[in-house]
């Protein structure tokens, strides 16, 4: 019995497709999407109007490549514990679909392409910041903090807060206060987001001896910390509008409503810190929170946004 030519062709194509999918999964694309949304917010806030399409596309691609490189290196370092944790054991490296040397070559290629593209199409500051983000995430967070400190996310969150700086720098060639406020927003958003996840999979982290906060101090104390960071996040988001004046009433209203809802959900979690459904709900909302907040920045920066902001400001009772 022999295979037809169509069958012989189909099997190699399926293998290639499976391998491409494995590399795609290695980069953690859902995380990249969220990082690129904050990059776009940084660009929009810096431009305060229409963006050069070529610059915008190049910056997003370059930022995406940098994030993919960082995530791949993270997967390389964590492949031993990923093989044990229920949530991660089927990732490409622990499952054997990609070999470590292949992942190394892939990650370094992505990092090099990111730097070259950002340096060519944007500027050296944007390229340098993206590279610094990779180094910070891999060396400081993944190697230095993740397995050794319960504050790993608090300090390591700075790596995830670099993309809006890259976006701002790509447009202006420098950094200013609004960019640093965006940086602070993402830094303060990170602990509630990841600690909510840690509450959901606390046993997994305990099994591999990763000292996430719920493992070290328990669920109740973690929920209180989530509430504290949510409380700090609200005035920080509003600082973009006042006193900096970098965002308008539409953003302000969105930030206020989102911040109050995050506080409400965090308070609910404090009342039932062992509730995984509440932790899951908070985790999912935190993703939508950051997406909508960045979307509000973009809306305020679009052509015609001043008239929209004026209409909102004139609304009775605003």
Swiss-Prot record:
Pathway(s) it belongs to: Porphyrin-containing compound metabolism; heme O biosynthesis; heme O from protoheme: step 1/1
GO function term, MF aspect, one: protoheme IX farnesyltransferase activity
GO CC, alphabetical: plasma membrane
Top-level lineage group: Bacteria
Chain ranges passing through the membrane: 31-51, 55-75, 98-118, 125-145, 153-173, 181-201, 206-228, 238-260, 285-305
Membrane topology: Multi-pass membrane protein
The keyword Cell inner membrane belongs to this UniProt entry's keyword annotation: yes
Main location: membrane
Annotated EC: 2.5.1.141
InterPro entries: Protohaem_IX_farnesylTrfase, UbiA_prenyltransferase, UbiA_prenylTrfase_CS, UbiA_sf
Keywords tagged on the record: Cell inner membrane, Cell membrane, Heme biosynthesis, Membrane, Transferase, Transmembrane, Transmembrane helix
Presence of keyword Transmembrane helix: yes
Broad class of enzyme this protein falls into: transferase
Reaction equation(s) it catalyzes: heme b + (2E,6E)-farnesyl diphosphate + H2O = Fe(II)-heme o + diphosphate
Subcellular location: Cell inner membrane
Family per similarity comment: Belongs to the UbiA prenyltransferase family. Protoheme IX farnesyltransferase subfamily.
NCBIfam families linked to this entry: cyoE_ctaB (TIGR01473), PRK04375.1-2 (NF003349)
Job of this protein: Converts heme B (protoheme IX) to heme O by substitution of the vinyl group on carbon 2 of heme B porphyrin ring with a hydroxyethyl farnesyl side group.
Note: Carbon 2 of the heme B porphyrin ring is defined according to the Fischer nomenclature.
Protein's recorded name: Protoheme IX farnesyltransferase
Source taxonomy: Bacteria, Bacillati, Cyanobacteriota, Cyanophyceae, Synechococcales
Gene behind the chain: ctaB
